């Protein structure tokens, strides 16, 4: 006993936070959803009033939305997802989640990103389109700066716009993302914003069409560096998912799968003005 008691106690302990482990984007989405406050219109900017309506409906109709602020502990305080010992059961399949994360990361890192970098190589406006003017690029970077955590913290601390801009143009030590692992480097925060604009973003969500159960949820490549959730927050074109709705509407109005339509370019009057849909390839068909 004395021999073992004299040996140092070694613990292989690692505290896991919300940035570690599997399904990080889904876990954070669930935390925000369950801990949402009752929507207040004044908390939403003018351009995002639609989100206020969506959240207000969810607050009334969805018991899970804001659950922690609708249900209270014995002392009357609201629940906290992380500190009150709640057990939250989800429909995520751990194997599908792992496959999804590997597939998204692998496809972007090994295929899409190299193709994008090859296309932008040597272009002075990279990663932006050459069609953008320098002032338009600066506007994009300034808007991204104002959305950053560094900017919000400095603004809350009382710094002026000029002081914040100076800080964003001052080189500082930082850790940045790369596909080969995090890199320690020195650059200005504004340069880091442009650096991150080079990275393609991707999202993936797998759902059982019969039950609506979400089986896999990948909001991005790395939650530590890209916290914007491309599943619920990313805006994208509707794509081919519109087809079932469009075809259902057509058949509801008397069309059948056997009907034929001329494969020609059409022009429609919209608000008194002619409008002609065009393909991205500029081909005049389809």
Please provide the spans of the model-predicted regions:
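Extended, non-catalytic substrate-recognition/exosite surfaces adjacent to catalytic cores, especially
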Residues: 1-273, 278-281
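C-terminal domain-closing interface element
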Residues: 283-286
